C-alpha cells in the first residue's frame, strides 16, 4: 500500500495562513498589553475626563471599557455578508487594519471617552479578524490539509 502525499500548498495559501496567524497573534498581544497598561492609563485619563481615579473608579471604568470592546467584537456577524460580497482576503486585511489603527489610536487617547470609542472600534476589527481568519484558511487550503491548517492556526 502506498501513502497518499498531502496536497502542496501554493504561495497564496501559505501567505494567507501567515496573515491570519499574525492577526490572531497581534490580538493576543494586544490583550496582554492592554491588561498591563489599563490601570495606569485610567489613573491619568479619568481626571482628564472629570472623574475620580480611585481604585473602585478605575475598576468600574475598566469594566465599562472591556464591555464596549466586547460589544464591538460582538458585531463580528456583520463581517460575514461583507466578506461574501467583497471577498475574504480583502475583508480580513481590512479587519486587521481597523483593529491595528484603532488600537494605535487608543494609545493616543486624551480622555476616557476617546479610549472607549477607540476600543469599541478596535473590537469591531478584532471580531472580523477572528470570524474570517479561520474561515479563510478553511476555504483556501485543500480539503486534505484543512484540519492541519485549523490546528496550526
Task: Go through each PLM region and give its residues.
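Transmembrane-helix signature of 12-pass secondary carriers
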Residues: 1-153
Amino acid at each position: 500500500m502506498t501513502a497518499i502525499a498531502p496536497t502542496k500548498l501554493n504561495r497564496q495559501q501559505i501567505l494567507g495562513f501567515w496573515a491570519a496567524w499574525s492577526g490572531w497573534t497581534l490580538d493576543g498581544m494586544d490583550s496582554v498589553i492592554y491588561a498591563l497598561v489599563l490601570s495606569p492609563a485610567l489613573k491619568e485619563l479619568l481626571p482628564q475626563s472629570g472623574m475620580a481615579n480611585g481604585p473602585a473608579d478605575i475598576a468600574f471604568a475598566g469594566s465599562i471599557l472591556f464591555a464596549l470592546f466586547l460589544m464591538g467584537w460582538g458585531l463580528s456577524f456583520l463581517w460575514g455578508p461583507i466578506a461574501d460580497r467583497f471577498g475574504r482576503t480583502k475583508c480580513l486585511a481590512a479587519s486587521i487594519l481597523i483593529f491595528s489603527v484603532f488600537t494605535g489610536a487608543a494609545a493616543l487617547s486624551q480622555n476616557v471617552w476617546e479610549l472607549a470609542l477607540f476600543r469599541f472600534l478596535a473590537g469591531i476589527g478584532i471580531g472580523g479578524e477572528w470570524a474570517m481568519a479561520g474561515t479563510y484558511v478553511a476555504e483556501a487550503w485543500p480539503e486534505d490539509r484543512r484540519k492541519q491548517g485549523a490546528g496550526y492556526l
